[in-house]
Amino acid sequence: MRTIVHLSDLHFGAINEHAIGALIEAVGALRPDVVAVSGDLTQRARAREFTRARAFLGELPSPQIVVPGNHDVPFHNVVARFCFQLSRYRRYITPDLEPFLMVGDDLAIAGLNTARSWTFKGGRVNEEQVTRVCERLSAAPADAARIVVAHHPFDLPPGVGDRLLVGRAHLAMALFARSRTDVFLTGHLHASRISQTGKRYRIPGHSALVLQAGTATSSRERLEANAFNVLRIDRSQAVIEHFVWSSTGMAGAGAFKTLGQERFARDDDGWRAE
């Protein structure tokens, strides 16, 4: 099985400084095949924030696949927001907004940019970019696990309004179903959750896993402490572990500890919990 560490919503510029070292140590100990970061590397897209984010990524194992989030688009500078929306992200993190990795012949993982200058908080995709991502995934070997990394969610917890769903989600999911996408790794909500697309989209023969990661390092915690996910996957099964920051209360010391795991097996319609 391949191991993917999924981090999201780092928010350099407003971080829990005590968690940084422990996170680097925890991720390194897991010896992942891929580290995926699903956006919001910075708080306000400032150069100094991107500099710290770049240094942090340099402390993590490779290969990595990273996509931007809405906080990586300038907020207060209107000219930069609309004319140079991701220029700093491209300069400090990666020029590729839709990266793609093939790990061996059994894991295809694609990045999808959902950040837009005109939506401020929300995200959106278009048919052209989703088609491009799907073509890459479809070209992978038949038995490869197919994963998409995006900042904005393709599914939501009960009671959360659909306005937080990525724009054109239903159009995108129809295309992802054709490319047999297995898993979505997303962020934005600062809350960890596992769900399946079949309950929302109801596409016959397709139900992908949606792994929502909390914020790995932000001091702006909402529903949980700093957290990240670990996905172990092959074509027939998936195992997800959820790691949460636990402070000892001694000068901010602490560690990321696992809260157990959930297991899923594949059948003809997608994934089922074991």
Residue ranges, per PLM feature:
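N-terminal active-site segment of His-dependent metallophosphoesterases
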Residues: M1-E59, F75-H76, L97, R132
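Active-site environment of divalent metal-dependent phosphoester hydrolases
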Residues: G13-I15, Q43-R48, N70-R81, R116-K121, ...
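Charged helix-capping and loop-helix junction motifs
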Residues: G21, E49-A53, N126-T131, D162-A172
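Extended active-site neighborhood of metal-dependent phosphoesterases/phosphodiesterases
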Residues: T51-R132, A140, L175, I203-H206, ...
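Active-site neighborhood of phospho(di)ester-bond hydrolases with catalytic His/Asp-centered motifs
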Residues: L7-S8, V34-D40, Q64-N70, N113, ...
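A short C-terminal boundary segment appended to hydrolase-like catalytic domains
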Residues: R232-E274
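Conserved beta-sheet core of the metallophosphoesterase superfamily
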Residues: D162-S236
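Short acidic, glycine-rich surface-loop motifs adjacent to enzyme active sites
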Residues: A142-P157
